[in-house]
Amino acid sequence: MKTLVLLSALFLLAFQVQADPIQNTDEETNTEVQPQEEDQAVSVSFGNPEGSDLQEESLRDLGCYCRKRGCTRRERINGTCRKGHLMYTLCCL
């Protein structure tokens, strides 16, 4: 189960690296409209519905958050998350 979560996180990180140039142009246009948008906590699930409860619980135990501007010093990048059409960095303690 941990291997699946790790592989999913690596896949999402690779996806973020490819989508990063597009995200930068979106952030530049959105900064004028929403200059002080706060970080938002979002639940993330992977795979089939049977294992999703365990995976969501693991992310909560790790203390994962979707951050717009990057992780804090105590956190590490663990992938990406999406809310609507915006991509965020998934940061875990």
Swiss-Prot record:
Coiled coil: none annotated. Pfam families: Defensin_1 (PF00323), Defensin_propep (PF00879). One of its GO terms (biological process) is defense response to bacterium. Disulfide bonds join C64-C92, C66-C81, C71-C91. GO terms for cellular component: extracellular space. It comes from the Eukaryota. Residues 20-58 form a propeptide. Residues 1-19 form the signal peptide. It is found in: Secreted. This is Alpha-defensin 26. The gene is Defa26.
